[in-house]
C-alpha cells in the first residue's frame, strides 16, 4: 500500500475500534511490520479520550501468502493463553468479515520487547541463560495446557495419539507438491523416508504452536515478553514443537546451543520438567 492509502486504512481502523469498544479514539499513525508469511501486520497508534496514546497490533488477512492459515485458529490459540504464564498479547477483537476494513483481521494490544533474527547468534547476549530458561519453560507450559478447557481443542477436528504424525505429514506433503513447479527429487526422497520411519504414537495430545523458535518471540533485556505467530497452531504431538525449536536450522553456527540460547541437554531438562512428558529420542528426531 502507498502511504496515503495506508493512512486511510489507519483512520478506518480507528473509526472501527471506536465503534467496537464504545470510546472515541483519534488516529495518530500506522506502520507496516514486515516479516510475516501469512498476514499483513501493522502497528497502529491511537489516542484515547484521556489523551493517552496506545499501540495496537492489526493483523489482516492477505489475498496471497506463503502459508495459508485460518485467522480464527490464530485468535483462538491466543485466547487459550490469556492471563497465563505463557506471555501473549491481550486480544481485542476478531473480525471474520471483509465488510469492515476490506479483509478479515484480528486486533491485539502491543507488547513491549523486540524480535531478533533467528540467524543472529549473538542476539540474546549476555542473557542467553535467562532467556533460554524461560524459552524452554514456556514451551513446556504450552505442552502441558489442559485440553479440557481449550478453545482451540473445541474448534479443531479431533485427533488421536496414533495418527498425529500421519496427518501432519500428509498436510505438508500436499502443501509442498501443490506449491512446487516441478518434481523435487530430494524432497520426495525425504518424504519417502519419513513415511517409512514413523515415530511412536504421541504420549499425549497437546496444543502445538506450530512455529515455536527463536525469531518468533519478543524479549526485553533478560525477559521473554511475548510468544508470537500462532497461525499454525493445532492439536497434536508436543514433540513436534520441541523438535522444531531444537532444529539445527535455528542454530547452525552454534549447533550445541539450540536457538542460540542454552545447551541442548539443559533445554530438554527444563522442557521435560515443565511438561511432565517422557520423550522418545527417535520420535523427537523424526
Regions found by a protein language model. Name each.
Residues 1-25:
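Juxta-kinase regulatory segment immediately upstream of eukaryotic protein kinase catalytic domains
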Amino acid at each position: 500500500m502507498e502511504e496515503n492509502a495506508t493512512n486511510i486504512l489507519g483512520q478506518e481502523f480507528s473509526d472501527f475500534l471506536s465503534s467496537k469498544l464504545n470510546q472515541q479514539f483519534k488516529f495518530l499513525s500506522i506502520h507496516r511490520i514486515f516479516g510475516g508469511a501469512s498476514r499483513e501486520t501493522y502497528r497502529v497508534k491511537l489516542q484515547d479520550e484521556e489523551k493517552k496514546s496506545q499501540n495496537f497490533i492489526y493483523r489482516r488477512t492477505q489475498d496471497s501468502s506463503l502459508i495459508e492459515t485460518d485467522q480464527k485458529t490464530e485468535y483462538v490459540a491466543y485466547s487459550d493463553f490469556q492471563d497465563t504464564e505463557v506471555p501473549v498479547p491481550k486480544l481485542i477483537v476478531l473480525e471474520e468479515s471483509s465488510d469492515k476494513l476490506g479483509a478479515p483481521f484480528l486486533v491485539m494490544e502491543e507488547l513491549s520487547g523486540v524480535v531478533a533474527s533467528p540467524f543472529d547468534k549473538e542476539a540474546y547476549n549476555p542473557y542467553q541463560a535467562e532467556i533460554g530458561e524461560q524459552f524452554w519453560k514456556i514451551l513446556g507450559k504450552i505442552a502441558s495446557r489442559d485440553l479440557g478447557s481449550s478453545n482451540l481443542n473445541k474448534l479443531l477436528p479431533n485427533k488421536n495419539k496414533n495418527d498425529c504424525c500421519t496427518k501432519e505429514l500428509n498436510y505438508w506433503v500436499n502443501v509442498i507438491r501443490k506449491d512446487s513447479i516441478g518434481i523435487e527429487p530430494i524432497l520426495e526422497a525425504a518424504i519417502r523416508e519419513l513415511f517409512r520411519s514413523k515415530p511412536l504414537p504421541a504420549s499425549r495430545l497437546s496444543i502445538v504452536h506450530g512455529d515455536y523458535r527463536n525469531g518468533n518471540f519478543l524479549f526485553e533485556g533478560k525477559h521473554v515478553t511475548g510468544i508470537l505467530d500462532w497461525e499454525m497452531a493445532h492439536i497434536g504431538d508436543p514433540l513436534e514443537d520441541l523438535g522444531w525449536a531444537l532444529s539445527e536450522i535455528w542454530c547452525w553456527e552454534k549447533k550445541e546451543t539450540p536457538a542460540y540460547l542454552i545447551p541442548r541437554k539443559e533445554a530438554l531438562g527444563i522442557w521435560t520438567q515443565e511438561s511432565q512428558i517422557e520423550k522418545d529420542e527417535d520420535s523427537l528426531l523424526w
